[in-house]
Amino acid sequence: MEKLEQIKLDICARIEKYDTQENTINKKFVNETNTIKELFEYIFAFGNEEVIMSNIISDRLKAQVITIDKLEEWFGENFLTKHNVYYYGKHIVYGGFKNVIVLGCAQIEVGSDALVYSFQNSTVNLTQKSTLYANDNSVFYANHYSNVYVMEYSSVKGQTFNYSHCTNNSNNAFINAFDNSEIDLYYRARVISHGNSIIRAYNDSIVLTSNVGNCCISLQHNAICYCNNPSAHIICENKSTAIIDFNNSIDKIKVTGIIEAKHNSLIKLYSDVRTMKVRDNAVVLDYTDTHCHPFDDTFILWMNKMQAWYNTKQSGDELTFIQD
């Protein structure tokens, strides 16, 4: 009964949040229902309240208050499909549906600005500016300006293409970024950058790059990048770390991109870099023993010859050379 009462409170709060002139759900009727099934039946009757319904089901699935078996027992497959709830099989859903729920092992392709919630082991192919909230062990493929939000504590796996965007909030999720897509990483999340992707990493997140494309990577707040891409543009700030040519291969790559470090960040170089900007207490560990132009209170350490370049003056002033 406590679960039912909490759901009623959530629904009433959403009714107030999304209240419009077309709103037909009555909070009095919501509060008079006696079971979760009866409550869902009442709300399902109003197709124009999809936002409220989808959020409520999503919340209860995440909290394991309801299950696939319960939904099937209460409503049946035909009823659920009619309301864009899928729990097995393959489906193609277009036409501007704003709320789709994918459960179990269902596979679905959606487009036309759809809003999708995925759970369990489902698979979602997003196109045409659709939006996905990915949970549990679901899999996604995002295309054509779609947006994906990987929810906390999930183990989602996904790929982004064609100007799509993903925000990853889970350290158990793993994303591959392709073809001009953009990724935001938080809380120890991980991504592999392919092609011309743009990555913004925060809060101990990890970025790995392939050796193709012209990726742009921004690291903040202890984020780490392992870079094997000679054309990468990497910006390190706020105690972040970039490791260039992390596999330390025999055939060293020539980095033609730009490496920037500032705000107590760390760069480890195993390859020669054409353009490097180091300032604001950043440190470079140079295993090639070639770079010697630090700026503004920064260190460049030659790791083989055990020499250090250090500048305590302003950019452009004479450098100080320290030899151990």
Which stretches of residues belong to each language-model region?
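Short, glycine-biased loop/turn motifs at secondary-structure junctions and
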Residues: 1-324
